[in-house]
């Protein structure tokens, strides 16, 4: 049984405190009503590491896939503590790979992007399980294809990764590729709670992989995702939040003006609608 959504420090406290969730689950475990105890999370890597380091859990469900490898160190720590690692929604949150862009299809050849991403995840020996939400029957066949190719993953994956990396450098420029995410303010410390790191990531995905549909969905969820997808999108830019305010918190960044221009572009593209989490639809 997994404690669902340890996304904040308060959530973790409620889970591990005396008389909290873990104590209750241990009693159920002793009564042979449940087996292993884990947790799922959309939280920051530092929070997930803190939860793993309590040594109170048997497994963790988290997000990690090719386009978002932020939790790589978390997965390595989970191995140190002998935790099972379950990857949440690698097809959908991994870039809407059920409806991939033509560019993504081309860059992942000879594999379908779903197959590539599955193999990318499972070639990491510290990853044990993927969830495979299926939009259509053909998607399931692609996941089975990935399983059939597990023993051959090294034949395909390094070449595709190199191709994707080179395209990223070609499109974004080497300087931006290497430095775009350095010295960015966290959303909590940004005027309007604008989540600049996530927004720049989405902008990069559009420019690099033509992931406009995925970027639109994530952009429109910001501001409506609570602790599951925290912070706000760029809709407040030039309304309640001025360029000058953002320049102040971006002082250490390699190109603050470029950041703001990218935020404006996202607002122009996607600022007309609000999305809801899947569980709220």
Could you tell me what each predicted segment is?
Residues 1-73, 79-87, 91, 109:
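Glycine/proline-rich, positively charged
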Residues 73-281:
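Structured C-terminal cap/extension of enzyme domains
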């Amino acid at each position: 049984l997994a404690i669902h959504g340890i996304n904040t420090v308060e959530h973790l406290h409620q889970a591990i405190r005396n008389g909290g969730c873990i104590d209750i689950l241990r009693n159920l475990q002793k009564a042979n009503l449940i087996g292993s105890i884990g947790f799922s999370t959309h939280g920051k890597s530092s929070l997930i590491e803190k939860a793993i380091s309590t040594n109170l859990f048997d497994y963790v469900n988290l997000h990690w896939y090719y386009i978002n490898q932020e939790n790589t160190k978390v997965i390595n720590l989970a191995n140190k503590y002998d935790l099972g690692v379950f990857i949440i929604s690698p097809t959908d949150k991994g870039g809407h790979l059920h409806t991939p862009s033509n560019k993504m299809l081309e860059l992942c050849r000879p594999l379908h992007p779903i197959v590539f991403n599955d193999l990318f995840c499972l070639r990491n020996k510290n990853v044990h399980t993927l969830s495979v939400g299926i939009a259509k029957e053909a998607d399931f066949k692609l996941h089975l294809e990935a399983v059939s190719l597990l023993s051959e993953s090294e034949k395909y994956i390094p070449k595709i990764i190199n191709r994707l990396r080179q395209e990223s450098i070609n499109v974004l420029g080497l300087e931006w590729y290497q430095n775009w995410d350095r010295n960015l303010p966290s959303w909590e410390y940004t005027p309007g709670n604008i989540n600049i790191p996530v927004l720049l990531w989405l902008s990069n995905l559009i420019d690099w992989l033509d992931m406009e549909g995925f970027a639109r969905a994530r952009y429109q969820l910001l501001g409506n995702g609570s602790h599951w997808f925290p912070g706000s999108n760029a809709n407040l830019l030039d309304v309640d939040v001025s360029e000058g305010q953002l320049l102040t918190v971006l002082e250490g960044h390699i190109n603050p003006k470029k950041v703001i221009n990218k935020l404006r572009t996202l607002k122009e593209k996607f600022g007309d609608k609000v999305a809801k989490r899947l569980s709220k639809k």
